[in-house]
């Protein structure tokens, strides 16, 4: 299990009688890219919040980088990098000022801080834009800057919640080139996405629907096993099956 970055068993989150995440089992090896797919309201973000140590599970158990999601949430927060769909940096600050600010938050100082900032600026292709106001950046550049800030403290696990939503195809491709490079360097990546071309770049994917993992595995193997042409067809079939055979929850309401 020491080779697993994320390991959950029957991890569940319930708000009142509303079941949002239902007994999810995950085993994500270190250095892998795991894609979490599903429609809006399927439970992806709730699952991520539990794994980040922000939201306590109702039941079940899980570890992130060896730390218990219930007992050691603060240790988890120190070890991971998180990036949301919404640009959450300071738009009135320049690229360099944002990096310096977040570097200070993570406790980086002096030459170590400067070296890490320069390393990430080069990785993200932001060289020459250091003095540009962050608010004037395009969507793709903003996301690359946000990724840099999430990587400053060299996290072992990077959690990305729909990082390329609303970003043009070229910028999405460049962003994923960076993610792939990080995985090669040993960083584990958990990413949620609506884009099937991005899902195909993952080592493994899981499709969540009404809080349940309907299917998981390697993209190519899933396509072959279900005799479909691509992931789009596979997930359309899954949703149609659920429409005809909705999940039962007794007195619980699934959202």
Describe the predicted segments one by one.
Residues 92, 133-137:
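Conserved ABC ATPase signature
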């Amino acid at each position: 299990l020491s080779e697993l970055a994320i390991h959950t068993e029957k991890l569940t989150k319930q708000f009142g009688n509303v079941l949002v995440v239902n007994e999810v089992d995950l085993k994500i090896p270190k250095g892998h890219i795991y894609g979490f797919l599903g429609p809006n309201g399927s439970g992806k973000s709730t699952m991520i919040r539990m794994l980040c140590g922000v939201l306590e599970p109702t039941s079940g158990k899980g570890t992130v980088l060896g730390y218990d999601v219930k007992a050691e949430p603060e240790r988890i927060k120190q070890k991971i990098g998180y990036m949301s769909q919404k640009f959450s940096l300071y738009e009135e600050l320049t690229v360099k000022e944002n990096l310096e600010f977040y570097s200070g938050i993570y406790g980086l100082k002096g030459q170590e801080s400067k070296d890490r900032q320069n390393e990430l600026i080069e990785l993200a292709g932001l060289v020459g834009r250091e003095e540009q106001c962050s608010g004037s950046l395009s969507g793709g550049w903003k996301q690359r800057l946000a990724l840099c800030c999430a990587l400053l403290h060299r996290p072992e696990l990077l959690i990305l919640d729909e990082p390329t939503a609303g970003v043009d195809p070229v910028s999405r491709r460049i962003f994923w080139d960076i993610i792939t490079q990080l995985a090669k360097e040993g960083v584990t990546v958990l990413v949620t996405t609506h884009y099937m071309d991005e899902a195909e770049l993952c080592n493994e994917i899981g499709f969540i629907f009404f809080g349940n993992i309907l299917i998981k595995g390697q993209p190519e193997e899933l396509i072959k096993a279900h005799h479909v042409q691509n992931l789009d067809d596979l997930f359309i079939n899954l949703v149609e099956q659920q429409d005809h055979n909705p999940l039962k929850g007794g007195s619980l309401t699934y959202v």
